Amino acid sequence: MSTMTDVGVPETSRPSNAKPWYKVLYIQVLIAIVLGVLVGWLSPHLATNPWIKALGDGFVKLIKMVIAPIIFCTVVSGIAHIQDARKVGRVGIKALVYFEVVSSFALILGLVVGNLLPVGHGLAAKPDAGAVAKYVDQASHMHAVDFFLNIIPESVVGAFAKGDILQVLLFAILFGFALMALGERGHRLRDVIDDTAHAVFGVIAIVMKAAPVGAFGAMAFTIGKYGPAALGNLIGLVALFYATAALFVFVVLGVIAKFVGFNIFKFLGYIKDELLIVLGTSSSESALPQLMEKLERLGCSKSVVGLVVPTGYSFNLDGTNIYMTLATLFIAQALGIELSFSEQVTILLVAMLTSKGASGVTGAGFVTLAGTLAAVNPALVPGMAIVFSIDKFMSEVRALTNITGNGVATVFVSWWEGELDHDRLHANLDKTIDPSDVETAVTTG
């Protein structure tokens, strides 16, 4: 059974029963990708058939369909519930400051690595001229003043109808603060928005069932049109993302852990069961209740855990941040689009906003990428099909990095607030966790 968290995303109380291997989404997508590679390699003519291409494009459109409502619901709910931070004094502000600083590190790290190791160069992917023409024409007439004025929608309905991410974000931010100001009078409306978010994520769950079909179509078309050499670029992106995420966890989060007074490797060992749950579901949210319980046992105060962890699932997704900047640069390189320094700075600024609309559910990172591309340079949007085929392989690492980042964030804010029990922290990290404790963590919620 699922409930809603404070940030308006569904909370899974425990992992589902084991499925037969052929029903596991990861296996289905893997098989679909292998079949797509074979079809694209052995029969390029068939692979480039419009109907095959439509499988991948159709799935991307299904994802784009829910971008606006997802961003609206999660941002509004996240801001509206921040009023709870008043009950715990400075914790809310400290958490948000931490989120912004560390998220910026993650975004910048992805951007730096993507520039130093441009694995997308040489792919020479070219989307259909018709698909790109309207974006290019639109961009050529867009000046800086027009860009900022365009953020303001002429109507709220129009913003959602066009799927303009920045316009939806602006309205969501204003609406969230207005709802927060209502206090208890806005309680019922917050519940409605939370329930709406739950339903929208249910739509994503349905859409994700078509992921194997979309992966097959996207991979078959990519290999059929660009040749087997495209695999090298795609594998390069996966490897680069894995290495960058590991660098972030062991260096950036490791330094933060060292500053507080604990070892990042021992912390990873402490939450190993939650990490395994996340690895199997590709969703950092699947282990949320267990993580909260373990952090309390680790010595973090209940009030800090109750605020920082749920809020972090909308405002502190480090793995998603790294993915967004890396994937955006990869797509630009693959399409032969040179991004200037100012455009790359824009990526950072836009990603800081769009990442706040990401949640810890499977596929949310890809949804957020779509929003970032649409806001930065719509001409990049058709390139989403290039990375979709391998998105599943990056989803697990995104989720693992996200949950680790939120765990470290909670310990840090507890320490900053002076509410971290160092004796319990070291007692738990320096010992082997009793099996009964693990069982308690898994069944809590």
Curated annotation (Swiss-Prot):
Membrane topology: Multi-pass membrane protein
Entry keyword set: Cell inner membrane, Cell membrane, Membrane, Symport, Transmembrane, Transmembrane helix, Transport
InterPro entries for the chain: C4_dicarb_transport, Na-dicarboxylate_symporter, Na-dicarboxylate_symporter_CS, Na:dicarbo_symporter_sf
Subcellular localization, as worded in the UniProt entry: Cell inner membrane
Residue ranges crossing the lipid bilayer per the database entry: 24-44, 62-82, 105-125, 163-183, 201-221, 237-257, 322-342, 370-390
One GO MF term: succinate transmembrane transporter activity
GO CC annotations, alphabetized: plasma membrane
One Gene Ontology biological process: L-aspartate transmembrane transport
UniProt xrefs under HAMAP family: C4_dicarb_transport
Function text: Responsible for the transport of dicarboxylates such as succinate, fumarate, and malate from the periplasm across the membrane.
Family: Belongs to the dicarboxylate/amino acid:cation symporter (DAACS) (TC 2.A.23) family.
Name of this protein: C4-dicarboxylate transport protein
Source organism (scientific name): Rhodopseudomonas palustris (strain HaA2)
